[in-house]
Amino acid sequence: MLPFREITLEDKPMVEHCGSHYNYHLCERCFVDLFMWRSHYNTQICFKDGFMLVKMSPLDGGHDCYLAPVGQGDLGAVLDALEQDAAERGLPFVIVSVAEPMIERIEAVRPGKFTFSHDSEDGDDYIYLAEKLRTLSGKKLQSKRNLVNRFKTAYEGRWSYEDMTRDNIKDAFAFHIHWCNLNGCARERDFEGETCAIVQALHNFDYLNLRGGLLRLDGEVIAFTFGCKATPDMFVVQIEKADHTIQGAYQMINQQFVQRNCNDVEYVNREEDLGLEGLRKAKKSYYPAMRGVKYVATPKG
């Protein structure tokens, strides 16, 4: 078996080195995502012959699965090693979150071996032009501009935005707990997992090179967000929370953060909607420039 183990902070340089050979716009390729959600998905990692290999457990209780190898070297040999690892563990060999360009790479080294399927868009990432999120320009985003302008008018002199720092991280986490209580989800398993992930990210904020922001009204936090630059041209927003009872709060934290923290990228990846109808509607309403489509690869026969 391959020597899979829990991912640690010390893996960050090697993960980023392996990922640098592929400019894939999927959030699963981001070290921050792998690290902060490691307990939730039982994420395990190992390195072999210049490649990063990842094994995860799906939330539906199904068999463990693998991410497609990223790195530089003999991709075919590494795929064979993963298949052997699955066999030795008594697992069906399944590779998830396969980017479209990776399909071409796999086909080049193991032609006709795999079937690639895309059964649901629930896990596909929403990827936007950073400029559009900064300016909210154009007819399609007029409703977003209106909400931002109404917020600024209604709360003139009462609202403020600030970048996340060591001094205000605790305020962001306190708002997360408030948000969970406000939405009646504090005891749900998924949100317990999210709380653990947020703790991991905020506790290691500087080492993970995160950027974040807080929106305040009358001095109290009403929204926060954070993420990281995952590729030379893409920023990934890992978390965004706002008080839904305050109209325009979500739109404000979105725009204010991107205006201040995403000027060095072309794209902003706001991750998937998980099949949640409200989240899907919200993400589609910003009109993504593209979707990060994720395929599943299984051996034929």
What name fits each language-model region?
Residues 167-220:
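Short, conserved active-site entrance elements at the starts or edges of catalytic domains
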Residues 28-101, 216-244:
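Conserved donor-binding loop and adjoining core beta-sheet/short helix segment
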Residues 210-300:
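Aromatic (often tryptophan-rich) hydrophobic motifs at membrane interfaces
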Residues 94, 160-162, 267-270:
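Short catalytic-loop micro-motif centered on adjacent basic/acidic residues
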Residues 110-189:
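Acyltransferase donor/substrate-recognition loop-hinge adjacent to the catalytic core
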Residues 92-109, 121-124:
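Short, glycine/charge-rich beta-strand/loop segments that flank catalytic centers
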Residues 102-117, 146, 274-291:
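Conserved active-site alpha-helix within GNAT-family acetyltransferase domains
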Residues 10-40:
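Intrinsically disordered, low-complexity, positively charged segments
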